[in-house]
Amino acid sequence: ILQFWLTFLAKEKFKGITYEIIADPTGNKINRLRVHVDSKISKFTIQSLSYHLEKNNPAIFVRDDLIHLNHFELDTCNLKKGQERVVMNELKKIILQLNSRKIKNNISQKEYSIKSNKEWLSWLN
Protein backbone atom coordinates (compact mmCIF):
# COMPACT_ATOMS: atom_id res chain seq x y z
CA ILE A 1 0.00 0.00 0.00
CA LEU A 2 2.73 2.45 0.96
CA GLN A 3 4.62 1.76 -2.25
CA PHE A 4 1.46 2.47 -4.26
CA TRP A 5 0.99 5.75 -2.38
CA LEU A 6 4.61 6.78 -2.95
CA THR A 7 4.34 6.01 -6.67
CA PHE A 8 1.03 7.87 -6.96
CA LEU A 9 2.35 10.98 -5.20
CA ALA A 10 5.59 10.95 -7.19
CA LYS A 11 3.58 11.02 -10.44
CA GLU A 12 1.31 13.83 -9.27
CA LYS A 13 4.13 16.16 -8.14
CA PHE A 14 1.90 18.34 -5.97
CA LYS A 15 3.61 21.66 -5.26
CA GLY A 16 4.52 22.19 -1.62
CA ILE A 17 3.69 18.65 -0.55
CA THR A 18 6.37 16.23 0.57
CA TYR A 19 5.99 12.82 2.13
CA GLU A 20 7.97 10.12 3.81
CA ILE A 21 7.47 6.67 5.26
CA ILE A 22 7.84 6.55 9.02
CA ALA A 23 7.70 3.74 11.56
CA ASP A 24 4.62 3.57 13.74
CA PRO A 25 5.54 5.60 16.84
CA THR A 26 3.64 3.23 19.13
CA GLY A 27 5.90 0.32 18.23
CA ASN A 28 3.41 -1.57 16.05
CA LYS A 29 5.00 -3.40 13.13
CA ILE A 30 3.48 -1.10 10.52
CA ASN A 31 4.64 2.01 8.77
CA ARG A 32 2.75 5.19 8.00
CA LEU A 33 2.92 7.82 5.31
CA ARG A 34 3.72 11.23 6.75
CA VAL A 35 2.45 14.10 4.57
CA HIS A 36 4.02 17.55 4.94
CA VAL A 37 2.51 20.75 3.51
CA ASP A 38 4.49 23.94 2.94
CA SER A 39 1.62 26.42 2.73
CA LYS A 40 3.81 29.10 1.14
CA ILE A 41 4.32 26.84 -1.86
CA SER A 42 1.07 24.85 -1.90
CA LYS A 43 -1.19 27.87 -1.22
CA PHE A 44 -3.20 25.91 1.36
CA THR A 45 -2.67 24.77 4.93
CA ILE A 46 -2.23 21.24 6.23
CA GLN A 47 -5.22 21.95 8.48
CA SER A 48 -7.37 22.69 5.41
CA LEU A 49 -6.29 19.46 3.74
CA SER A 50 -6.95 17.39 6.86
CA TYR A 51 -10.32 19.03 7.56
CA HIS A 52 -11.63 18.52 4.03
CA LEU A 53 -10.39 14.93 3.86
CA GLU A 54 -12.32 14.14 7.03
CA LYS A 55 -15.46 15.94 5.80
CA ASN A 56 -15.23 14.22 2.43
CA ASN A 57 -17.46 11.38 1.25
CA PRO A 58 -15.90 8.93 1.78
CA ALA A 59 -14.22 10.38 4.83
CA ILE A 60 -10.44 9.96 4.96
CA PHE A 61 -9.27 10.17 8.56
CA VAL A 62 -5.70 11.16 9.25
CA ARG A 63 -3.47 10.96 12.29
CA ASP A 64 -3.33 14.64 13.19
CA ASP A 65 -1.58 14.55 16.57
CA LEU A 66 1.28 16.70 15.22
CA ILE A 67 -0.63 18.77 12.68
CA HIS A 68 0.67 21.95 14.33
CA LEU A 69 4.06 20.90 12.91
CA ASN A 70 2.57 21.02 9.38
CA HIS A 71 2.18 17.31 8.83
CA PHE A 72 -0.21 14.44 9.37
CA GLU A 73 0.03 10.71 8.85
CA LEU A 74 -1.95 8.22 6.82
CA ASP A 75 -2.26 4.80 8.39
CA THR A 76 -2.71 1.63 6.35
CA CYS A 77 -3.76 -0.76 9.10
CA ASN A 78 -7.54 -0.55 8.63
CA LEU A 79 -7.71 -0.39 4.83
CA LYS A 80 -9.39 -3.14 2.85
CA LYS A 81 -8.16 -4.27 -0.55
CA GLY A 82 -8.53 -1.48 -3.11
CA GLN A 83 -9.10 1.29 -0.58
CA GLU A 84 -5.52 2.53 -1.01
CA ARG A 85 -6.60 3.83 -4.44
CA VAL A 86 -9.65 5.53 -2.98
CA VAL A 87 -7.45 7.33 -0.42
CA MET A 88 -5.11 8.68 -3.11
CA ASN A 89 -7.90 9.61 -5.53
CA GLU A 90 -9.72 11.53 -2.81
CA LEU A 91 -6.49 13.17 -1.64
CA LYS A 92 -5.88 14.34 -5.21
CA LYS A 93 -9.46 15.60 -5.53
CA ILE A 94 -9.22 17.64 -2.32
CA ILE A 95 -5.80 19.07 -3.24
CA LEU A 96 -7.12 20.19 -6.63
CA GLN A 97 -10.15 21.81 -4.96
CA LEU A 98 -7.89 23.57 -2.46
CA ASN A 99 -5.61 24.81 -5.25
CA SER A 100 -8.56 26.17 -7.22
CA ARG A 101 -10.05 27.69 -4.05
CA LYS A 102 -13.31 25.80 -4.54
CA ILE A 103 -13.12 24.95 -0.84
CA LYS A 104 -11.69 26.90 2.10
CA ASN A 105 -7.91 26.65 1.85
CA ASN A 106 -6.64 28.76 4.76
CA ILE A 107 -7.89 27.00 7.88
CA SER A 108 -5.56 27.96 10.73
CA GLN A 109 -4.40 25.74 13.58
CA LYS A 110 -6.72 27.55 15.98
CA GLU A 111 -9.72 27.22 13.66
CA TYR A 112 -8.89 23.56 13.01
CA SER A 113 -8.74 22.83 16.74
CA ILE A 114 -12.10 24.51 17.31
CA LYS A 115 -13.74 22.67 14.39
CA SER A 116 -12.23 19.35 15.48
CA ASN A 117 -13.37 19.76 19.08
CA LYS A 118 -16.90 20.71 18.00
CA GLU A 119 -17.10 17.67 15.73
CA TRP A 120 -15.67 15.41 18.41
CA LEU A 121 -18.20 16.62 20.98
CA SER A 122 -21.19 16.74 18.60
CA TRP A 123 -22.11 13.14 19.37
CA LEU A 124 -23.14 14.27 22.87
CA ASN A 125 -26.15 16.16 21.52
Write out the residue ranges for each language-model feature.
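Structural signature of PLP-dependent enzymes
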Residues: 1-7
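Conserved C-terminal alpha-helix-loop-beta "cap" of PLP-dependent enzymes
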Residues: 8-107
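Structural signal for terminal/edge beta-strands and the immediately following C-terminal loop/tail
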Residues: 97-125
